Structures are given as C-alpha cells and as structure tokens.
C-alpha cells in the first residue's frame, strides 16, 4: 500500500515537473528566461508587442480598456498563429498635452507621454526582442492616436535590419478591424452611426463586455461625459462579433506580412 502511494506521488511530481518545463502560457512575462530561450529555439520566433493606453472611457468603463483588450486579443491571435508569444503591454502612450490639458488629458486618470518617448520605448523593446532571437516583431496598437508613430518605428527598424533576416511589422489592420470595420458591421445590423460611436460608445463597450466585463459599470451606461456614441444597448454578443473579426483579420495580415519577407 505504501509502495503504491509512493509510486503515485512520484508520478504526480513527474507530471508537475513536465508541465513546468513545457508551460502553456504565451505571455513572455510568465516564462522563465530558459523557457523563453527554448521556445524560441523550438520555432516560436514571432513576438507580438501589444500597445494599449491608459485613458478615460466615460463614467462606465475603466481607464485600462485598451490595455486589457489588446492583452487578451493578443493572446487569442498568438494561439491561432501557433509560433508566437506575447510581450508585456505598453500602457503609456501619447494621449494629449498636459499644460494646458488637451484631448483625454482633461479627464483624471489619463496618462500621457510624448511621441518621441513613446517611439524610443517601441524601438528599445524591439531591439531587445531581436537580441532574444525573435525573427518577427509585431506591433499591435489598440489606440488610434499613435498609429503613425508605430508605423514609423517599424519602417525604420525594418530598413535597418534588412540584411539580418529580422523584421518589424506595424499591423494597422488590427486597429482598422477594431474601429472602422467593426463599426460598419454594427451599422449593417441596424445600429446607427451616432450610437455605434467612436469612443466608449456601443462598439467600444460591447467589445469590452465580450473581452472582460469586469471593466464595465453596467449601471452607468449613458452617452456624454467623455463618451462619443451611446453605450446603452451594448452587449457581449455584439462584442464577440468584433473579437472574431479582429482576430481573423489580424492573423491573416500577420501571416501575409511574414510570408512576404
């Protein structure tokens, strides 16, 4: 009896150790450096760099909307790709001026950095990933305000690395799918343009309800006060349409970008 128990215990320890050696997580920050090294050697040579932003989203949605959304969508995208890992979210982005406060900086809790600081963070991060052995560094930006910065950094690095076989990509299709395409999809289902909105309205809020409803205050859904659109008819079923659209479009675009190199 004792021998059987010891055997079962040994099997349990062996199984646990095997799981530790082969983690299922795609998030870089959840891996040890040796696990990361081995995953890159095994073929996971694409790193997704999710870029969010910390800003007001009306009285009904948390300041971390962009960060949470791009974090979870990047995981889905990485798992579909199969050869990708996900870097920590870049949460500090250009959001407007401070003195005087402009754009979202007029609301408490929004955090901004200058464009040059933001670009240096992207560039330094990408150089770190190249050093770690990644061959394709993919920027996914969840916010519209820095798309040009993101594209500029990727273009400069890709030109510099032309002879190395390492490439930087700014996947603008991710943002287009989450904004213009998703809005058109909702409008095709009978929702008005003013209701769908461009910031924290029906589209934005429905996406968050599908991704992480904890960040939405259901008793505060209302237009105005930092909201562009009307979130009152938001629901996770509509949001899931957006999630599926974003993941599909982004995966297809990344595959094409990598194949072209």
Identify the function of each model-found stretch.
Residues 1-2:
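N-terminal secretory signal peptides that target proteins for export/translocation
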Residues 20-138, 142-261:
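Extended, histidine- and acidic-residue-enriched regions that form the cofactor-binding/catalytic faces
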Residues 5-15:
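Bacterial N-terminal signal peptides
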């Amino acid at each position: 009896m004792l021998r059987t128990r010891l055997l079962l215990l040994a099997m349990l320890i062996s199984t646990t150790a095997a799981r530790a050696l082969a983690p299922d997580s795609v998030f870089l920050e959840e891996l040890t450096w040796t696990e990361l090294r081995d995953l890159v050697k095994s073929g996971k040579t694409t790193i997704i760099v999710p870029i969010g932003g910390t800003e007001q989203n009306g009285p009904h949605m948390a300041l971390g909307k962009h960060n949470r959304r791009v974090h979870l969508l990047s995981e889905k995208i990485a798992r579909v790709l199969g050869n990708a890992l996900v870097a920590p979210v870049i949460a500090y982005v250009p959001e407007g001026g401070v003195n005087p406060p402009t754009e979202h900086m007029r609301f408490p809790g929004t955090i901004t950095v200058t464009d040059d600081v933001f670009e240096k963070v992207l560039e330094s991060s990408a150089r770190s990933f190249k050093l770690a052995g990644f061959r394709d560094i993919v920027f996914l930006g969840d916010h519209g305000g820095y798309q040009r910065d993101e594209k500029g950094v990727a273009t400069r690095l890709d030109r510099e690395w032309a002879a190395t076989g390492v490439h930087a990509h700014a996947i603008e299709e991710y943002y287009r799918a989450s904004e213009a395409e998703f809005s058109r999809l909702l409008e095709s289902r009978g929702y008005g343009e003013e209701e769908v909105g461009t910031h924290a309205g029906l589209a934005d809020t429905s996406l968050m309800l599908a991704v992480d409803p904890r960040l939405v205050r259901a008793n505060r859904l209302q237009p105005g006060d930092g909201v562009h659109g009307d979130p009152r008819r938001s629901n996770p079923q509509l949001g899931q349409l957006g999630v599926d659209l974003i993941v599909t479009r982004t995966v297809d675009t990344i595959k094409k970008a990598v194949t072209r190199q």
